[in-house]
């Protein structure tokens, strides 16, 4: 009986997550017999409660690539501290390859001002008011990874105070 309840709770937790496909691209591998075609899917998964992840999957069909991307995204979940204004605590920069992302907290009601895969990441993380700028690259995968790198660097005010040895 108790096993059934646990599985129901797990299913409820699973339904909170949303998935958005950023890019599906047909890629080729040159082999002795010619070219082997496969598909690469870039997918972002988040629960709009401060958790988000980027997944990449490759398979011979699109559905298989998306499934692999979902499982990869669940392994790479990042926790995001969100303020009471549904923004981020401070300005932060992230980098992946040539892609750079700058994120700044914004006033309530301004919305998510960002482009491409960075916008998708911020929306699925649950951030409502933010300014973000992509620099250096148009590659959606590197921009998504740069955004998650920036979100990893975020700290709450209490975490910063604790790091500095200040107690209030």
UniProtKB/Swiss-Prot annotation:
GO-annotated cellular components: chloroplast; small ribosomal subunit
Residue ranges occupied by any S5 DRBM domain in the UniProt entry: 17-80
A GO MF term: rRNA binding
UniProt entry tagged with the keyword Acyltransferase: no
GO biological process: translation
Principal cellular location given in the protein's record: plastid
Cell compartment(s), UniProt: Plastid, Chloroplast
Organism domain of life: Eukaryota
Family annotation (InterPro entries): Ribosomal_Su5_D2-typ_SF, Ribosomal_uS5, Ribosomal_uS5_bac-type, Ribosomal_uS5_C, Ribosomal_uS5_N, Ribosomal_uS5_N_CS, Ribsml_uS5_D2-typ_fold_subgr
Keywords from the UniProt entry: Chloroplast, Plastid, Ribonucleoprotein, Ribosomal protein, RNA-binding, rRNA-binding
Keyword field contains rRNA-binding: yes
Function: With S4 and S12 plays an important role in translational accuracy.
Family indicated by similarity: Belongs to the universal ribosomal protein uS5 family.
Quaternary structure and partners: Part of the 30S ribosomal subunit. Contacts protein S4.
NCBIfam families xrefs: rpsE_bact
Notes on the domains: The N-terminal domain interacts with the head of the 30S subunit; the C-terminal domain interacts with the body and contacts protein S4. The interaction surface between S4 and S5 is involved in control of translational fidelity.
PANTHER family: MITOCHONDRIAL RIBOSOMAL PROTEIN S5 (PTHR48277:SF1)
UniProt name for this protein: Small ribosomal subunit protein uS5c
Organism per entry: Rhodomonas salina
Protein's gene: rps5
